[in-house]
Amino acid sequence: MTSFSKSDTCVIFGGSFNPPHIGHTVILSYALDYFNADFYIIPTKTPPHKVVDIDFDKRFEWVMKSFKCFDTYKKNQIFLWDLEKHIFGVNYAIKNVEYFRKYYSNTIILVGEDALGNIEKWYKYEELLNITTFAIYPRTRDGSLYKRGQQILGNLYSNVIELRDFPLIEISSSDIRKRIVEGKSIIGFVDGEILEDVTNTYLMHHKSHGGNWNE
């Protein structure tokens, strides 16, 4: 692999995308205007701290369709990569960062403020923050998790960019799954192209598991 553009910075936007929703695309839109960088959208196959029962290929397909809206805007800076499809078992953020550091001078992990709520559970989080930057968008109204991050990370917090001007996204994948099984509409929550498939997939999953979620 080589850098796909002349940028010396890459932004890694990962997650289970279970399912991808409008909040993900809004955050990427803001980030594209904030950072002069290449962006890599990397769906997680096997997250370290939770179980995701929906097949990786299905979620990757949803992400591909959801982010098609960027085909006419800075598309040469955005790369959707099925990197984790080819990794057996759990992968960790630090492994991805170490890979991208071979090709970029600067790496940035784009993540929500809620990541600071359990940052101690991240694999080698101190080492990770010594070699990369976290760009953190809001997930709470009072910014309480930013404050927690400052307390926990101490001097390492100098490697955190607070994206407080980004919109507070109060949509979550777990809320969407909950709405589906409760028979509520998710119109406007996910891209229209995946709306029916997302709804049917989670309804079938919920039914096949006796009304229980593993996640």
Swiss-Prot record:
Top-level class of the enzyme under EC nomenclature: transferase
GO molecular function terms noted in the UniProt entry: ATP binding; nicotinate-nucleotide adenylyltransferase activity
Keywords: ATP-binding, NAD, Nucleotide-binding, Nucleotidyltransferase, Pyridine nucleotide biosynthesis, Transferase
Keyword presence, Repeat: no
Pathway: Cofactor biosynthesis; NAD(+) biosynthesis; deamido-NAD(+) from nicotinate D-ribonucleotide: step 1/1
Family annotation (InterPro entries): Cyt_trans-like, NadD/NMNAT, Rossmann-like_a/b/a_fold
Enzyme Commission no: 2.7.7.18
Known catalytic reactions: nicotinate beta-D-ribonucleotide + ATP + H(+) = deamido-NAD(+) + diphosphate
Gene Ontology annotations of biological process type: NAD biosynthetic process
UniProt function note: Catalyzes the reversible adenylation of nicotinate mononucleotide (NaMN) to nicotinic acid adenine dinucleotide (NaAD).
Family of the protein in this entry: Belongs to the NadD family.
HAMAP family: NaMN_adenylyltr
Designated name of the protein: Probable nicotinate-nucleotide adenylyltransferase
Organism, as annotated: Fervidobacterium nodosum (strain ATCC 35602 / DSM 5306 / Rt17-B1)
Gene that encodes it: nadD
